[in-house]
Amino acid sequence: MMLDPINHHFQAHEEAYYSRFFNEQRGLHMIKVLPGGVYVSGQEELICTGLGSCVSACIWDPVKRVGGMNHFLLPFHNHFEEKHWHADELLSGASRYGSYAMEMLLNQLLSLGARRERLRMKLFGGAQMMGFHSMIGEKNVEFVLHYAEQEGLEVVAYDLGGLEPRKIMFDPLTGKAWLKRIPFAEINRLRREEERYAHTLEKQTDKGSEVELF
């Protein structure tokens, strides 16, 4: 599912923002969440993604045994806005989009029977990628930690910031997560993927539509 900060609904072609494949070694289907995507599940499968400056929240209900993952970054129009933004600026375009990305994941989990008071969260990403918006990773980390605190969501583990991109695998039933540092050879591909996503957000948010939070 793709987060749409302008029209505030899922794009018609949801499958374009995650891919499904069978991992023979693990004997499970795996779903790769792409930038801007959200995926939730109550099935025996693994959710995975690659993260540079973007962040992912992995959230699950250990009683209902449902969980999900998002993959997003905050949209900034220019370096000045990025540099001077802070997480307590709740009405800024960046904060509203970040909140929308989180609420989309939470609401999808609640629709599967999860209870908000039982939810647990693990956070990943926000690396400082050389040559790509020097502060964007830091701002993404600041936002997601502030959001969790403000919403009273329990963060049981996190691996945020630093210089190295990450690969994440997440079991939506148990909340178990695996992390692997991405080799240098893969960094350019991931950077290009995130830059395309960032440019798409810039074009969309320039249209000036309001984001409705729920």
Curated annotation (Swiss-Prot):
Its EC number is 3.5.1.44. It comes from Vibrio vulnificus (strain YJ016). Keywords: Chemotaxis, Hydrolase. Signal peptide: none annotated. It comes from the Bacteria. PANTHER family: CHEMORECEPTOR GLUTAMINE DEAMIDASE CHED-RELATED. GO terms for biological process: chemotaxis. Coiled coil: none annotated. One of its GO terms (molecular function) is protein-glutamine glutaminase activity. Probably deamidates glutamine residues to glutamate on methyl-accepting chemotaxis receptors (MCPs), playing an important role in chemotaxis. InterPro entries: CheD-like_sf, Chemorcpt_Glu_NH3ase_CheD, Cytotoxic_necrot_fac-like_cat. Belongs to the CheD family. Disulfide bonds: none annotated. It catalyses: L-glutaminyl-[protein] + H2O = L-glutamyl-[protein] + NH4(+). The lineage of its organism: Bacteria, Pseudomonadati, Pseudomonadota, Gammaproteobacteria, Vibrionales. This is Probable chemoreceptor glutamine deamidase CheD.
